[in-house]
Amino acid sequence: LYTLAMENGFSPCDEVRHVEYTLIDENGKPWTPRNANKKLIGDMVTVKWGLANSDNWITAYLMSKLNPYNLKRLIHTFGVRNRDIVPSVSLCLGPCEISVGEMVSAYTAFPNKGIRVAPLFVTRIEDNDGNVLATFAPEMQEVISVSSAYKMLVMLRAVVNEGTGGRVRR
């Protein structure tokens, strides 16, 4: 969702009020995500802070400005093959099945300036004498702009350096 936001003109520095947001789901019913984060309630926080702190309210705010169908489309563009993804407002919190390989492949777009590199398990085949019988190159596809990729790198670093991912540094 944050990548979709960056692709649609949002910036990591954009400020959002840290309050509960209620969206209308695909059945016309109100949907309000719960939030474990009790910091800065009512204050203005940045989009980057929202991702760094895994904040469901900021995520819901972004979904209110975007579209679950566009999010589903972007998820597939990033190489996720699951066709059972439901384009609902709750998709912003990530309730869909994605394999580790798909996740790794999707995340390659950020350090590669928006180009996703598909997993490649065999790079070449040789015979017993070392002669190369076949070579294989990874499939690459531009999935987001260079600008969005850079903004996502900034925000993902904040997850580890300032937010909920800090445990991986210890």
Task: Enumerate the predicted regions with their spans.
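Short, charged/polar low-complexity linear motifs in solvent-exposed/disordered segments
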Residues: P30-W31, T77-G79, T135-F136
